[in-house]
Structures are given as structure tokens and as C-alpha cells.
Amino acid sequence: MKARAAVLSLALVLTACGADPPDYSSLLTSPPTTTTTNTSASDKPQPIAEYLYGLGVTGEQVPLDKLTDLTVTLPKPTGWTKYANPNFSPGTTMIAKNNTYPTAMVVVLKLTGNFDVAEALKHASVDAEMNQNFTKLNSSNDTFDGFPSAMIEGSYDANGKRLHTYNRVVIPVTPAPKFQRYLVQFTVTTLADQAAAQSDDIEAVIKGFTVTVK
């Protein structure tokens, strides 16, 4: 698949709000000439983007309103608005309450290349766990809307603040004959000391998030 123009890093997506999202920039480039599964003895956790890239998988970021065979719904509670930033990678959708925390972000990548979905999802939470002083509160490997998925919830330190995050990766696939795979990244972030006060809105966003095949 052709590389995206400028190959913008998704690590820039939440810079303005102080969070540290997964970096999928490697998937927006051409794959390595020799692909491996990286079976070295190193104990260093491998993020899902790095894992997929090592298998030669590439991805094209697709805005939510440009998806033709998939529908991804990001609900917007009262008081939440679209959060725009020129540093965002093209196609990123982010909303925020009163232009600050809490925030919700969705990134969709159209994938090219074969890989073991179950194995890939073992790497889905690594980015979150690599955040500074990350403390896991909850996790799940249950399917989401009928698709393979991994979720992790926890708190971490960033820019002098303690943040609470809910992070879900979903890997849907369209029916035959296309069998097109996507990677959907959904992240909700708020200040940890405001998580209880903002729980109604956060719960509404999480419960309203859906992934369906058209």
C-alpha cells in the first residue's frame, strides 16, 4: 500500500491534551523488505503497531465519514465538541468536553497484509502499559460488537497530571468476498481526580461507541 503523504505520526494526536496515544506511523509506511515475527529473547513489550509492521502489515488511515464498508460510531454528549488540531494525523476523530478533559479519540486503519488476529491483540494494550507509572484497573479480551478486541483501563502520569484512560482496540473484518480487515482504536481520557465527577459523560461515550459492518 502506498505510504500516506508526509507519513504523520499518530503520536501527535493527543499532544495538545497531554496524553500519549499509540503510534501507528510505522503502519502508514511501506513494509520492510524482509518480514519477521521478532522472536528474539528480549522481554521488551512490543506495541501492536510494531508487531504488525514486523509482519509486513501496512495501514491506510480512513476518516469515519469516508468508511464505505464499516460504520464506527462515536457519540457526542451535550457540551462535547469536535477537537481540532493541525498536528492531528489526517482522519483522526477527537471530541472533548469544553475543549479540555475529558476527551475521546477514534482512529481507523484499513489494513493490508496477513496476520494472526488473536496474537496481534496480545500486543494491543502495550502502548497504554508503557505510559509513566501506569496502574491497570481493568482489562478484557472479550469480543466487541462481535469482533475480536482487547480493552485496558488504568491511570498514568503525564505532564504533571494523573490521567485516567480507557483504551480499546477492535479488529473487524468485512464479509466475503473482500474480507477487509480494519484496526479501530478508541481511547477515552480524563483527569484522574475528575473521573468520578465526569463518569456519566464518560460512560455515555463508552457505551455509545459501536463498530458495525455495513
Label each PLM-derived region with a short phrase.
Residues M1-G91, K178, T189-K214:
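N-terminal targeting sequences that direct proteins away from the cytosol to non-cytosolic compartments
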Residues T58-T68, T93-K97, S140-T143, G154:
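Short acidic-hydrophobic surface loop/beta-edge motif
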Residues L67-D69, Y101-T103, F147-S149:
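Extracytoplasmic
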Residues T93-E119, Y166:
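A short acidic-to-branched-hydrophobic micro-motif
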Residues L111-G113, Y156-N159, T190-Q194:
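Solvent-exposed loop/turn segments at secondary-structure junctions
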Residues E119, H123, D201-A204:
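Extracytoplasmic/secreted proteins, especially bacterial periplasmic and envelope-associated proteins
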Residues S125-P177:
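Signature of long, low-cysteine stretches enriched in small and polar/charged residues
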Residues P177-V184:
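Short hydrophobic/glycine-rich mini-motifs in sensory/regulatory modules
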